[in-house]
């Protein structure tokens, strides 16, 4: 077995993140109920697929990709568990303020990860910046019990998710065609 070039796992992780983020934030802006579609995406595409992408980033020696994808994949799995376990009678419903603290911790983590993007593509920077803002607003909205803030956060989440999908498609198409099809603001 010789040196086999590994495929880029980032588009898989970015799509899992982006699509699941859009679906959850369609709920946050009030378009859809928090139902099985969002939960299933949270488990399988947002959760498991991102963790798989992170493990492939590990194989490539990419600490940032490993940390980002396995962490956010775990975020989706824990969020689904937080929302689903009370419905299964396994625990009480989450306290909104404590959910805000949970989201705030993810915001702090994301802020530090944002600093790790500053040598990367501009679109990646935007994904992490908008995700930091999203987590901050969701944390504040839950802690304060303010539905308007959560609703506004949903719009930020839609933009964040769409930017992650754009980045994923940029990486796929730019590699596939060997040229810039979708500009992602590559660092030089």
Range-by-range predicted roles:
Residues 66, 70, 74-103:
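Helix-adjacent hinge/juxtasegments
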Residues 101-112, 122-143, 149-170:
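Alpha-helical membrane segments in multi-pass integral membrane proteins
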Residues 1-8, 18, 174-188:
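Extramembrane terminal tails and long inter-domain/linker segments of multi-pass membrane proteins
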Residues 26-35, 85-97, 143-151:
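Helix-coil boundary and interhelical linker segments in multi-pass alpha-helical membrane proteins
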Residues 7, 56-64, 115-126:
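Membrane-helix interface "capping/anchor" motifs
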Residues 1-53, 57:
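N-terminal topogenic module of multi-pass integral membrane proteins
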Residues 27, 52-56, 78-90, 109-116:
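Membrane-helix exit/interface motif
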Residues 34-47, 93-105, 128, 154-158:
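Structural signature of hydrophobic alpha-helical transmembrane segments
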């Amino acid at each position: 077995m010789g040196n086999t070039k590994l495929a880029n796992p980032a588009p898989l992780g970015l799509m899992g993140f982006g699509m699941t983020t859009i679906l959850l934030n369609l709920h946050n802006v009030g378009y859809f109920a928090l139902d099985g579609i969002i939960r299933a995406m949270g488990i399988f595409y947002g959760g498991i697929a991102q963790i798989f992408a992170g493990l492939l980033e590990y194989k490539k020696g990419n600490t940032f990709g490993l940390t980002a994808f396995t962490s956010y994949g775990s975020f989706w799995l824990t969020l689904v568990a937080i929302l689903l376990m009370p419905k299964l009678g396994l625990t009480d419903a989450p306290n909104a303020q404590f959910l805000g603290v949970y989201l705030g911790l993810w915001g702090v983590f994301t802020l530090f990860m944002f600093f790790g993007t500053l040598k990367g593509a501009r679109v990646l920077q935007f994904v992490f910046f908008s995700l930091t803002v999203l987590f901050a607003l969701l944390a504040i909205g839950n802690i304060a019990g303010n539905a308007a803030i959560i609703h506004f956060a949903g719009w930020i989440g839609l933009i964040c998710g769409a930017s992650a999908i754009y980045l994923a498609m940029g990486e796929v198409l730019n590699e596939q065609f060997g040229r810039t099809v979708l500009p992602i603001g590559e660092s030089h």
